[in-house]
Amino acid sequence: MSDMKVNFSSKIIDSTPSEEEVATQQDSYTKSGLVAPSLDSQALKKAPRKRVIKENIAALHTSSLERVHQKKVLVQNLAQLQRGLAKINGRVELEELIDGFSVKELLIKRNPKIAEEYGEGNPLMIRSLRFSNPQEVTSKLGAEGKTPAKREVDTICNKSTLHDIVMTPASLVKKEVRMNLISEVPRAKDKQKYRGLPSVVYGQSSRRSESDYLTSRNGFGDVHSLKSNNAFNSDYEKICGSLSHAEKLGLIERNLTPFIRHDPDRISTDFVHSIEELAEHQMLLQSRKPASALRHNEYCTKLELWDAKAIAVGESRALAVATLIEFNLEMLSIAQEIDDDGHKSKMVADFIERQLSWLGPQTALDSKSTLERVSAVTIQEREFIANEISRSLRQGVSLCTYDKDEAGSHIREMSLLDFRVEEIIEGISIFISSKLLHVTNAGEA
């Protein structure tokens, strides 16, 4: 991403633009993608006032503004639902009430396939949500500008920073292995930004696509967690701009190799390059430590928002409800964004470029070769990919638990209807309150 810089000048030469300047300004609006004023000052004087206002309002009804409006309507409907929940007695009445609201798609999501596939031995990935810093733990949810759920969505979608999000490290979980989630690890008070928060379960779609490269998530992993930020050193910053996505990930791997932890029980002294291989190493490590739950591992890859399948409930069931609502709301909005933009969607284009930078699990293409492959993708193929992504996003996420026992671990599907009404009401309250402007101590001073 590039910075948008605006330079202001205090010297005013002439307050009335010439025709040439107006034309130049209109051209600059077109190139920048901004919405140009639809009427000049002379037209405003001549045209009937009411008609001009209506025309200007209509001109501002862009697809992005429409999505913002849709979000507001859904939040308002949630508030109405919350009031109705106070009068509910029993699960049947709860389901009937939710069925009567347009927010049902944010709340009642079922995905039994996740639990089934996990039970059949397929590995999944888990990322625990986090606060931006330990101090945020004690403040109101969203008081720092974003909730943990919104921060996760923006990170996955590359909408959170001026830097390219090359990878989103996650921990692999498998039914034969008992693993402690990051959110479950005891930490000092100054390092509790994960503690007790829900986690997002990511998985590859079992549905085979016409384009196999849509489902691959190449990367590298370790049976232990490592400080992946060590990879982004000054050398990386100097050359990353000229590298393809696959080349960036390769450089990150080389930078992190010195940080591989020594452990006499580990199977390999190197990184592995597939989720399946990491799963095998985790199972071997578990067999050598049968009485222990393993510490969280780390697999470095670029997950996509449509890989998200479920929200694993943390310590607070109400917070899990709030997270479910926010994730489904954001996924619906982004699906609509892709539908509006079609094959021209930047999110789709970036995804295609990332995926085509790989020629196999470990072979990275340079930027030139990647762009040559990208240019060969037809409009029809782009439309197909956009539709597949939108379809996956609209499936949303459901609720689940990650449980451990002597035999290993289990993903168990949950429904919002399994929650007490009080927990649902509190969860909706948490979500709605997180959208309000909170006055911080700094603002009160």
Swiss-Prot record:
Leftover remarks: This is one of the putative proteins coded by the open reading frames within the region required for AvrBs1 activity.
Domain of life of the native organism: Bacteria
Biological source species: Xanthomonas euvesicatoria
Alphabetic keyword roster: Plasmid, Virulence
Protein name as it appears in the record: Uncharacterized 50 kDa avirulence protein in avrBs1 region
